[in-house]
Amino acid sequence: VLSPADKANIKATWDKIGGHAGEYGGEALERTFASFPTTKTYFPHFDLSHGSAQVKGHGKKVADALTNAVAHLDDLPGALSALSDLHAYKLRVDPVNFKLLSHCLLVTLACHHPAEFTPAVHASLDKFLSSVSTVLTSKYR
């Protein structure tokens, strides 16, 4: 459960990310593919090379979904319901991959915003991404 302090940290961090969310999403996705090659199996039709427009485009979709989630911190299941359906019923993404991408997103944010990435912010963002992952995998059961 996200505390009021977590919600404040998440919103403040996302505000600082601003227009870079799509860029960071693409970078995190590329980092995920490089660090965890098995994640590539869900994207056989993508050009997965460094700087790929397809990876950047999908990274922007990830970032847009997270931006929507940040705007609905009190109703993540409602905000992410359609995305949960897509990943559970159509794409059938292994739930572990959400944790891997979450980790890579945290690393990406820490690289770009080291001063703001305090232990408290890190913990809040980790809880947020874990909550998002839980919602996205809730319909697998």
Swiss-Prot record:
Transmembrane segments: none annotated. The modification Phosphotyrosine is found at Y24. Heme b binds at H87. Residues 1-141 form the Globin domain. One of its GO terms (molecular function) is heme binding. Keywords: Acetylation, Heme, Iron, Metal-binding, Oxygen transport, Phosphoprotein, Transport. The modification Phosphoserine is found at S3, S35, S49, S102, S124, S131, S138. The modification Phosphothreonine is found at T108, T134, T137. Red blood cells. The modification N6-succinyllysine is found at K7, K11, K16, K40. It comes from the Eukaryota. GO terms for cellular component: blood microparticle; haptoglobin-hemoglobin complex; hemoglobin complex. Gene3D superfamilies: Globins (1.10.490.10). The keyword Transport applies. One of its GO terms (biological process) is hydrogen peroxide catabolic process. The modification N6-acetyllysine is found at K16. O2 binds at H58. Belongs to the globin family. Involved in oxygen transport from the lung to the various peripheral tissues. Heterotetramer of two alpha chains and two beta chains. This is Hemoglobin subunit alpha. It comes from Meles meles. The gene is HBA.
